[in-house]
Structure formats: structure tokens, C-alpha cells
């Protein structure tokens, strides 16, 4: 059976490559980018992932963190052993808890075209949604119910702007 053509070729050392740079590049690629800034700052590359998370007071394995109680055949109560995990970096845990407790603000906004459309409809027809459905600016032929939903969405997403608009109408 014939041999592959270039399989027996002698390997040559490439003097053009910077080995130090290649090693740094490999290490950087092998260590993933940690998105959370608190964990990233407290991370120690010399320690394992499990050890790093244990030092911060975080769980590496959720099955070990909250183990399921096994049902035993005998009724003798076995006391669970207390956890010996010592949190070396509690500030990370405190910062994560503080960040999680902050209320998340609603970032949903409507397009300027939709805001302009709703304002035109209210300016022309007030609360008459049937008349809005017959309006010539109703390009997408929205039903009265769809227009009512768009107005309600505008009220919910931009309450101050909606109130200011109603005051400007008089």
C-alpha cells in the first residue's frame, strides 16, 4: 500500500516565529473572558476554577452546593456535616448581591415613527378608535383594537412624554 506523500518529511524549526508570543497567545485563548467585572478582578489565574469560585463564596458544582437528601431505609437521623468552606473574598459576593438587588430599569422604547403615528391619531380623533381605523394615515390598516394597544404601549413606555402631549392639546 502506498505511503502518504509528505508524511516522512523532516520537521524544520521555524526561526521566524516568536515562541514567547505564541505561548502568551495560547494562554490568553485558553483562559476565557470573564464578563462579570467583580469576578474578573478577583480571579487568580494560578488557581483552578473550582478553587477561585470557592474563595469567592460561589458554587462550582450546583449538585454539591444544594445536595438532595437521600431517603434511607432506617429511621435513624444522620446529622449533615457542616460545610467547611471559608470565604476568602466576601466582597465579591457582597457586590454580586448588591447588583442583583438593584431594580432593572425598563429599557423598551418605541420607534419615533410609531410615536408620531399615535400622536397624530390622538390629535385628530381623541379616543375614537373606530375613526382612527378609518384614518388615511392608517397605512397598515390596523384595527381599532390594534390601535388601542399601540396607544396603551405608548402610555406605558413614555408616560411623561404622553402626559406632556395631552397637556399641549389642551
Curated annotation (Swiss-Prot):
InterPro entries: Ribosome_biogenesis_Nop16 (IPR019002). Its main location: nucleus. Pfam families: Nop16. It comes from the Eukaryota. One of its GO terms (biological process) is ribosomal large subunit biogenesis. Keywords: Nucleus. GO terms for cellular component: nucleolus. It is found in: Nucleus, Nucleolus. Belongs to the NOP16 family. This is Nucleolar protein 16. It comes from Tetraodon nigroviridis (Spotted green pufferfish).
